[in-house]
Amino acid sequence: MEYCASDDWRRLVHETILPTALAGVALGDDALEIGPGPGFTTDILQTKTAHLTAVELDEGLAAGLAERLAGTNVEVVVGDATALDFEAARFTGAASFHMLHHIAPAEAQDRVFAELARVLVPGATLVAADGVYSEGSAVFHQDDTYNPIDPAELDPRLRAAGFGSVRVRTYDLGWVCTARLT
């Protein structure tokens, strides 16, 4: 987690990952972010929507983010993305950035996709980005869960969860995906 809280990671998120992922994406006025970590992605996402709910599993990270963003349009919630505590069809868009590889096994990732489909309104967009498998990343995550998603598997997995119009593209840092809920 140390690197994910670093200035180097913040710069990469702000200058490359989110500009690449969010180009042409509209999240609507009530968006959901899963796995914000220290909130570098949240800082940008909060400017793209009227209200942002950020769901973080780690209580310490959630508390720090909630304190830092108190009084803004961001609500930070401690929660598990495989079992979201929200009513169906609540959110107008959803985002996840470099978090899905921390979920194992693949069936748990698929539960996240299904939960996102459940809490999104019809026609809403999910935008996600993550890295692809590499030996370097495997070593970096040796004391952590590391279960990267093969970008070739995203389309069928997201469609099985209820998404359509799935678009996956790869770039230097991994993959970016947008999917519209049918």
Predicted regions and their residues:
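Class I SAM-dependent methyltransferase SAM/SAH-binding core
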Residues: L32, G37-A83
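A short glycine-rich, Lys/Arg-flanked "PGG" loop and its adjoining helix->strand segment in the class I
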Residues: D110-P122
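Conserved alpha-helix/loop element of class I SAM-dependent methyltransferases that forms part
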Residues: R10-D29
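C-terminal alpha-helical "lid/dimerization" subdomain adjacent to the S-adenosyl-L-methionine
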Residues: C4, W9-R10, T125-T178
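A short His-aromatic
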Residues: H101-P105
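A conserved beta-strand element that flanks and buttresses the S-adenosyl-L-methionine
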Residues: A95-S96
